[in-house]
């Protein structure tokens, strides 16, 4: 039963953080950032927020990470306004490499298909 609550809170945080990034955060470094997944710690005190960015450049990835870290306070404050929780979890932002990995696999499969 508790796992359902953890999953629901994670989904709600994902939706709200995406909304906050689009509407409230004006930092150009976080433009184009999309939240892909939120993993909650069992006691709901920590949320690992995985994000992706359209650009593959390392400098853009670093800028996005820095921008998200700087905006953490704003995001957490806005989450406090939107969520009915006793304590808003601490946010840790990590780059989600699964999309790039999937694109790499897709490219390898296309290359194999073209060779045969």
Curated annotation (Swiss-Prot):
UniProt keyword annotations, A-Z: Cytoplasm, Ribosome biogenesis
Recorded superkingdom: Bacteria
A GO-annotated cellular component: cytosol
Keyword Cytoplasm: yes
Gene Ontology process terms (BP): maturation of SSU-rRNA
Subcellular location: Cytoplasm
Pfam family, one: RBFA
InterPro entries in the record: KH_dom-like_a/b, RbfA, RbfA_dom_sf, Ribosome-bd_factorA_CS
Keyword Plastid: no
Gene Ontology terms for molecular function: ribosomal small subunit binding
Function: One of several proteins that assist in the late maturation steps of the functional core of the 30S ribosomal subunit. Associates with free 30S ribosomal subunits (but not with 30S subunits that are part of 70S ribosomes or polysomes). Required for efficient processing of 16S rRNA. May interact with the 5'-terminal helix region of 16S rRNA.
Oligomeric and partner information: Monomer. Binds 30S ribosomal subunits, but not 50S ribosomal subunits or 70S ribosomes.
Family: Belongs to the RbfA family.
Xref: PANTHER family: RIBOSOME-BINDING FACTOR A, CHLOROPLASTIC-RELATED
Name of the protein: Ribosome-binding factor A
Gene: rbfA
């Amino acid at each position: 039963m508790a796992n359902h609550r953890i999953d629901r809170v994670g989904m709600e945080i994902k939706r709200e953080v995406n909304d906050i990034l689009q509407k409230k955060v004006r930092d150009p470094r976080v433009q184009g950032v999309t939240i892909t997944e939120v993993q909650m710690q069992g006691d709901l005190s920590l949320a690992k927020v995985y994000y992706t960015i359209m650009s593959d450049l390392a400098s853009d990835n670093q800028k996005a990470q820095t921008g998200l870290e700087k905006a953490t306070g704003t995001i957490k404050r806005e989450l406090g306004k939107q969520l009915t929780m006793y304590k808003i979890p601490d946010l840790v932002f990590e780059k989600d490499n699964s999309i790039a990995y999937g694109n790499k696999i897709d490219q390898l499969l296309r290359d194999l298909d073209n060779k045969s």
